[in-house]
Regions:
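Small-residue-rich hydrophobic transmembrane alpha-helices
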Residues: 49-113, 146-168
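Conserved active-site and cofactor/substrate-binding residues in soluble primary-metabolism enzymes
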Residues: 9, 21, 45, 51-54, ...
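Helix-terminus/linker motif at the lipid-water interface of multi-pass membrane proteins
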Residues: 26-55, 59, 77, 115-125, ...
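Short runs within selected transmembrane alpha-helices of multi-pass transporters and secretion channels
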Residues: 65-68, 139-158, 164-179, 192-208
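Hydrophobic faces of transmembrane alpha-helices in multi-pass small-molecule transporters and flippases
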Residues: 3-34, 39, 59, 63, ...
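Short alpha-helical transmembrane segments in multi-pass integral membrane proteins
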Residues: 1-19, 75-142, 183-232
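Hydrophobic alpha-helical segments typical of transmembrane helices
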Residues: 10, 22, 34-35, 46, ...
Length: 232
């Protein structure tokens, strides 16, 4: 009976963790919509290339997202067990795995992006295939930046500092909006190709010092109830 009783403190703590995580995806999506809208003004060829490239990019991004999700669980467990020093070990190990995966993905997309694009684009559409390949070549070159973003963001979320993780999504949104409003009208499709990578860089510029701040706090806290992080 006691376990089924409503616990206001626990509910507030769960909401403090869950709501920022949900808002983060909404905030990031706003920037992506802005970038797509800017690309739509460049013509049908750019729209088709962007659509095909995004499908392929999202497929190859899945392992990076999975690494991040694994780090959220790993860091949360070790934080709860009073072993925060292992969080840094996990970040280093997952970063190594990420770089190994990037080498493989870089080789595949730099050599076979046009071939893969033919799953979505007719072989006769040379311009669209070229634009799709250009987008993928730029994106995969910055996958280490994206991988670090996923690892650090989910690690920070895993130990309860969800508001800081959400702010990295705000950084991404700002970067994509700036690219959409300033760079795309001036430089065209090539600016669209660099839109995501610019957002990833902006997010990492926030996440790296944020993780350093969080990790230093973790080392000073022996137990997770020593100072509740959910409000940060």
């Amino acid at each position: 009976p006691g376990e089924r009783r409503f616990n206001g403190r626990l509910a507030r703590q769960l909401l403090g963790i869950g709501v920022p995580m949900g808002l983060q995806f909404s905030i990031t999506a706003i920037g992506s919509i802005m970038l797509q809208s800017a690309n739509n003004a460049l013509g049908t060829a750019c729209v088709a290339a962007f659509t095909a490239a995004m499908r392929i990019k999202m497929f190859f991004m899945c392992p990076l997202e999975s690494l991040g999700i694994a780090m959220a669980t790993y860091s949360g467990q070790n934080y709860g067990a009073g072993r925060p020093e292992r969080v840094w070990q996990g970040v280093r190990a997952s970063s190594l795995l990420m770089m190994v995966y990037w080498v493989f993905t870089f080789a595949v997309l730099m050599t076979a992006s046009r071939t893969i694009a033919r799953l979505f684009v007719d072989a006769s559409e040379t311009e669209i295939l070229n634009d799709t390949a250009l987008f993928l070549h730029v994106s995969v070159s910055f996958f280490p930046v994206l991988g670090l973003l996923c690892i650090l963001r989910y690690t920070i979320q895993g130990v309860g500092y969800t508001n800081l993780a959400m702010l990295s999504g705000v950084s991404e949104m700002i970067a994509r909006i700036l690219v959409s409003l300033l760079a795309v009208p001036a430089f065209g499709y090539i600016a669209v190709c660099f839109g995501d990578s610019t957002a990833w860089i902006f997010a990492d510029l926030f996440l790296i010092p944020a993780f350093a701040f969080v990790y230093r706090r973790l080392l000073r806290m022996k137990r997770p109830d020593a100072a509740g992080p959910a409000g940060l």
